[in-house]
UniProtKB/Swiss-Prot annotation:
Single biological process term from Gene Ontology: translation
Family: Belongs to the bacterial ribosomal protein bL17 family.
Pfam family, one: Ribosomal_L17
Self-association state and partner proteins as the record states: Part of the 50S ribosomal subunit. Contacts protein L32.
One cellular component term from this protein's GO annotations in UniProt: cytosolic large ribosomal subunit
Name of the protein this chain belongs to: Large ribosomal subunit protein bL17
């Protein structure tokens, strides 16, 4: 039974939603900060936290799993190299969501998601 197993649907079919989250995750890891809608920021937060936890593990299986999710191979290697000294003592809470002003065109709630 799937009771209480919620997924952020984001108004998209499953394949488009997966591609959107992969793209946002890749850009967040690359740039450290991304401006997006509040719902997308909340959805991408769990994916990025999983990738950072995989990188903290550092095993070959974790690296291959991250390579299957993040679009850029060099970005995965850089993430695995620098994550131990950046997040080594922290158990979760690697991202921060900051609410900003609403988008002008459709008044959507916007947010900045950044790596701490």
């Amino acid at each position: 039974m799937r009771h209480r197993c919620r997924v952020h649907k984001l108004g998209k079919p499953a394949d488009q939603r997966k591609a959107l989250l992969r793209s946002l995750s890749t850009q967040l890891i690359r740039h450290g900060r991304v401006t997006t809608t509040k719902a997308r920021a909340k959805a991408v937060r769990s994916q990025v936290e999983k990738m950072i936890t995989l990188a903290k593990d550092g095993s070959l299986a974790s690296r291959r799993q991250a390579l299957g999710y993040i679009y850029d191979k060099q970005l995965v290697h850089a993430l695995f190299d620098q994550v131990a000294d950046r997040y080594g003592d922290r158990n979760g809470g690697y991202t921060r969501i900051i609410r900003t002003i609403r988008r002008r065109g459709d008044n959507a709630e916007m947010a900045i998601i950044e790596l701490t």
